[in-house]
Each structure stands twice: as structure tokens, then as C-alpha cells.
Amino acid sequence: MKDILKLSIAEMHENLIKKEFSAVELTQAHIDAINNEQLNAFITKTPEVALNAARKADHILTHEQDKITSLTGIPVGIKDLFCTKNIKTTACSNILRNFTPQYDSTVVKRLIDDGAVMLGKLNMDEFAMGSSNSNSCFGPVENPWTRADGVKVVPGGSSGGSSAAVAGFLCAGALGSDTGGSVRQPAAFCGIVGLKPTYGRCSRSGMIAFASSLDQAGVLTRTVKDAALMLQPICGYDTQDSTSANITTPRFLDSITNIIKGKRIGIPKEYELSNKYKEYEEVSEMWLKGIKYLENEGAEIVNISLPHTSYALPVYYIICSAEASSNLARYDGIKYGTRVNSDNINEMYELTRGNNLGTEVKRRILIGAYALSSGYYDAYYNKAQCIRRLVTNDFVESFKSVDYILTPTAPKEAFAMDEQLDTLTMYLNDVFTVPASLAGLPAISIPIGLSKNKLPLSLQIIGNYYDEGGILNIASVIEKYTGNILK
């Protein structure tokens, strides 16, 4: 048998059914791996909670087989942005370092109710703001991959702990969040599958807010089939979330047929950057390889234009920063957050927020407050919302002539941990993922191969609203050609 940790979720499920090993044995193997990990992926470990859940899973596997699901006894990790009952939830910020929720977020509850075993909470960029997982009060996360010259690289962000844990075989799958690419970009950097569903497909109840009109739960796994299995239980309408979509959730696994003959795949010219920037050539070559794979399977390739793409990144950072400045205003040390006491209330606010919020979070709060200020609201925030509609309309028009859109996920491979990127360069890591987020569309990142530095490169498939099954199927076709690059 393969190393128990390196099995896919589907393979783990099959072996649990066959009694090749128990859920407790599977869970203990992961606990041992976590205790010895050097990636700094897990920040809160819950071994007793996990073993109790595994014992319950073993009981179901033996005595209540009608209750078995695809995730019964499967060990998973949870990004520390999702509330977990009686388990610390910090968003990796000092201001919430001691916060323990009294309830589970909806998506966590649905995972646990479906039989998944929670191993603990995963590191992330503070309040999900970042592309490298270096903005965490618990320290940076290390990518399991290293460059060919031995240099350590970042896992991406903000779900860097989730992507590193899955790629490093510390858990079978992980829950992440995606606001502008925070599931897809780290998945690309770590060579795994990362899926962001349609906005509203998964409940945001109990998920610590960054930008409420963009935030969406997502999954990170090692295979496309696993992504379908993990996504299934967390979808569905929730009365606790006013943005939750009240529509039926299909069985995603049924959509993975590997049949794409006649499907029209859009290739947006605006995503081709290698003509201007030589450093993006490797990604463009892999993009062409992915196009060829889909052509081989009978798909029709269609050149399309998304003319407002160039505005997406600045629009995104205005909108998400504005929403963050509003959402994070609650952390003042009185109702929420670790308080720094002072005799003067204004000084207390200043010390509490100044000492307990990180540099990137404060930067975005300031950007957002500026964009929302009375003198600049129309010039920045209102205009950004108007352009967001134009970006969305580009996709709506394109989906009248194509079924899916294929792009790179990130412009380059993962960068070195000790590489000091300026803020703008860091933001550019999300240049390909942000447009789909602004439009609220589902998108998946799938590994396509390795760079010359032996680091993962990935492609992104964007689908029409609520067509998660379709993007899973396209990703599965690419996976058929590339295999599992983690091997």
C-alpha cells in the first residue's frame, strides 16, 4: 500500500470501507506528521478532538453503514478564518489571539456533520490579506516545495497554511477562503487543486469577514475528484447568510466524465503577458500546453477579449480595502479584540489597533478609509463599483459564446521566502485570479507542470455561475495528462 498519508481522499475512503486501516489509525498517522512538521502550517492542533471524531467514524464504518459518507473518517485542516466551537479562531492576528468562538461556522459544521475529522487550525495571512503567508502573527509558512537550487519559497496566500498542509501530506484536504485568489494562488504555488465556488454557493456565516462582497469559502485538495468530494457537503443555502444562494446543489462527482468534445474554451488575449514581460514566458508556454490537451479531447478553442481586465486589480484593491476598513472597525478592544488599556479612550483605541494589527492590515484599512471618505467616495469607491460591473459584463458577454475560460492562475512560480517584494509586485500575484472574484464566478486552479526551477505552475479554469461541476470536469481532463505532480 502507498504511504497512508499520500493517499487521496477517494483512496482513503476506499481503504476505510475495506478495513485496510481504521479512521483512528489514519488520524493518528496525520497527528504524528503534524507534530513533526517544519512548515508552520498548523497553528492550533486538536488531536483529542480529532481522535474522538475518528472513533465515532469507526463506529459508523462498522455499525451504522447507512450513515457512511465520502468524508467519514477523513482528516482535514481548517483555515483559521472559520469559527470553530471552543477552539481558538484568530485570523492570525494579535487582536484576536485569545478569541474562542462559542459556535462553528456553517461550512465547518457541515464538514464535521459529514464525518470529516478536524485536525486543527491552519496558518494564514492576517485577516486573509496577503499573497505569501508572511503576514501572520504566528510567523510565515514554508512551501513543501523548494527551488532547484535549494532556496525555500513561499506557499502563497492567504490560504498558505492550507495549501502547504495539503501539499505536505499533513491533511487530506483543507478548507480555505478566497477573496481575490486566496485559494487558487496558493494552490498554484504548492502544486495542488484549489477551487473557489460561485459567490453565494457556500455560506459565509461564522467566517471572519475581510471583504463581504467577495469572500467565499473554498477547498484545497491533491486531486480534482477530492475537490468535488470536499466541496459537496459545504455547499447549500443557509438562512444565517443573506448572500447565500437558495438553489439546489448538484452532485459534483457526476459532472466529472472527462468528456469535453464540442465544449468551447475561451482564451482571453488580455491574460497574455509574455509579449511585454519576458519573465512570464514559462507560464505562457504551460498555458499553450493546457490548450493543446483540451484540443486533443475535442474541445474548440476560441479567442476572446475581456477588455476591462486591466482595471480589475486596482478596482479590487479599492473595493476590498473599503470593505475591510468597515468590517475591521469592530476590533476596538471594547466589544472585540485584545485591549491595550489607557486612561484616555481615544488613546486606548489607537494603542489597541496600532499595536495589535499588522502592517498590511493597517495599510488596507487606510486605503479603504480614504476611498470611503466624503471627498473621495465618488472618485474612488463609487467609480470602482461601476468598473466592477463592466468587468462582470465582460464575462457575461463571453459566456454567450464560450462554455469555459482557460487562463494561467499566477503570472510566475512561487518566489523565495527571503525575497522582499514591494507592495505592488506582491499584489500582482493576484492579477489573473481577481477578475473572476469581482464577477463572483467559480474558478479552479489545476497544476500543469514544473518550471525550470522545479516549482509548480498551474492553470485556472473559470466557469459560468454555479457551474462548479463543469470546471471540475475540465480540470479533470488536464489532470489526466499531467498526473499528480506531487508524486
From Swiss-Prot:
Catalytic residues in the record: 79, 158, 182
Top EC class for this record: ligase
Entry annotated with the keyword Protein biosynthesis: yes
Keywords annotated in UniProt: ATP-binding, Ligase, Nucleotide-binding, Protein biosynthesis
Catalytic activity of the protein: L-glutamyl-tRNA(Gln) + L-glutamine + ATP + H2O = L-glutaminyl-tRNA(Gln) + L-glutamate + ADP + phosphate + H(+)
EC number assigned by the record: 6.3.5.7
Domain of life, per lineage: Bacteria
Cell cycle found in the keyword field: no
Record GO terms (molecular function): ATP binding; glutaminyl-tRNA synthase (glutamine-hydrolyzing) activity
Record GO cellular component, one term: glutamyl-tRNA(Gln) amidotransferase complex
One of the GO biological process terms: translation
Family, per entry: Belongs to the amidase family. GatA subfamily.
HAMAP family: GatA
Functional note: Allows the formation of correctly charged Gln-tRNA(Gln) through the transamidation of misacylated Glu-tRNA(Gln) in organisms which lack glutaminyl-tRNA synthetase. The reaction takes place in the presence of glutamine and ATP through an activated gamma-phospho-Glu-tRNA(Gln).
Subunit structure: Heterotrimer of A, B and C subunits.
Protein known as: Glutamyl-tRNA(Gln) amidotransferase subunit A
Species name: Ehrlichia ruminantium (strain Gardel)
Name of the coding gene: gatA
